[in-house]
Amino acid sequence: MTTALDQLKQYTTVVADTGDFQQLAQYKPQDATTNPSLILKAVQKDAYKPILEKTVRDHRNESTDFIIDRLLIAFGTEILKLIPGRVSTEVDARLSFDTQRSIEKGRELIKLYEAAGIGRERILIKLASTWEGIRAAEVLQKEGIKCNMTLLFSLVQAAACAEAGAQLISPFVGRIYDWYKKQAGAEWNEARDGGANDPGVQSVRRIYTYYKTFGYKTEVMGASFRTTSQITELAGCDLLTISPDLLQKLQESNETVARKLSPETLQDKPAERVAIDEASFRFQLNDEAMATEKLAEGIRVFAADAVKLEKLIDALR
């Protein structure tokens, strides 16, 4: 019997969302993604503490920022030994509103990978999908540095990323689901509001349809899943990045997975492109309470985890 994971791989590029790279081999993902929270989680495990300790030891007299960059590269390098494709490495969330420093950080990370013998074609630089982050991606893409736009919760963010020529976007599913479920409170009905009607699933479907309708080349990678149902409802999306626990559930399941998204079977096609000059971008994002709140919260959480990682490093000096 073919597993749900194997069926999914027929329609979609499967990506592992983890810093715990020892789990990668069993799921055979094409790519992998990391973020500050996942790296923080990994370095607190006994299996990965030696990577943190060695990185600090080798660069003890350098700045904490310098050490964090080397730590990210150390994890990315190990991950790339286990997958055939690309790894995503995230720019510090505290630079989310600073275009120039985001550009500089993206260039620095690519230089470090190249110094480690890894070509830029195997790296995606992750940036928050703020106006400033999108402008940074526009510059980096023109330099041959491919970008993965994260913390993406709305069509206007997706439209702006595509116009900027970003390589890939990561529209979040689970965090959108969380927001709407919390807003609904006791009125939420999983049978009615989940599955194909899940607001997070619908958001990715809308973005996928928009991109394919207007011929954008930017890849759509659904992210932030809470359940296997959210994943299988998006079978056919260009890529899906999935945590090890959900990869495990898909591997253990023999449920039939049917293709749900395809460029040939688009429904509810948009009539026109979204206006995305800076003023309209900011207004449309502000007008969508969920996207505004979740973007702000996501940046705060990633920034807080970056601070925790700095404290771990400083304690080892």
UniProtKB/Swiss-Prot annotation:
Superkingdom, taxonomy of origin: Bacteria
Active site: K126
Pfam families attached to this UniProt entry: TAL_FSA
Record localization: Cytoplasm
Protein family membership: Belongs to the transaldolase family. Type 1 subfamily.
Subunit field text: Homodimer.
Name of the protein described by the UniProt record: Transaldolase
Organism: Burkholderia cenocepacia (strain HI2424)
Gene: tal
